[in-house]
């Protein structure tokens, strides 16, 4: 990233990032299309009614992961491998804690949120079932986004895009299997999406394990207030920005 035409390098790095983030939102579009074909119009409407509610959580996760990865890219750039490993370890711990808390909050507010958005009664049950299942997979989504953000911080924007492409194809296959063959309906579509995200995480994790920089030792897992504070200062404002955008979309 420091040698060559800056504009070309930025475009080549940013394009996979944009496509990968957009790809995560396509999961729900695939779910909606297959559910609409296999179950019916009401099921299609139920999935569609959850769009902004789920994107709110997804965008918060993406923002936090990207913010937490900024110090990692800094330490990578200056060649400080010790602090880099510590920042990676701290990112994992923060994502685990925030992921658990976010999952609990989202599961609690799912029903009130759909009510607040005036979801029609005839599709409310299906929308709630889909949203609860998707919210139940928040830790998996956060794990993928953190792994992908770490890879990007190390200059690898292609692996997360490949992971999303593989997961996207898997999501469609599982949608067809769970919805049309097994007859699981809306629940099947949500389970397919969560499973596809899990596959995307495993792919990124597998690639990370190949890197010598990722040989994190026991001492690296110690809590370091300065690193955690720096990551939170970067991640939370980004998350707040995405929350405001999502709330605007809901309104």
Question: Which residues does each predicted region cover?
Answer:
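Short alpha-helical transmembrane segments in multi-pass integral membrane proteins
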Residues: 1-14, 72-139, 173, 181-236
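Transmembrane helix-bundle signature of multi-pass secondary active exporters and lipid flippases
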Residues: 17-70, 134-141, 229-251
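Helix-loop interface residues and adjacent transmembrane-helix termini in multi-pass membrane transporters
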Residues: 29, 38-41, 75-78, 153-154, ...
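Alpha-helical transmembrane segments of multipass membrane proteins
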Residues: 29-32, 104, 112, 146-150, ...
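Small-residue-rich hydrophobic transmembrane alpha-helices
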Residues: 45-104, 141-160
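Alpha-helical transmembrane segments of multi-pass membrane transporters/permeases
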Residues: 95, 150-176, 187, 191-194
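Juxtamembrane/interfacial segments around transmembrane helices
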Residues: 144-147, 215-223, 241-250
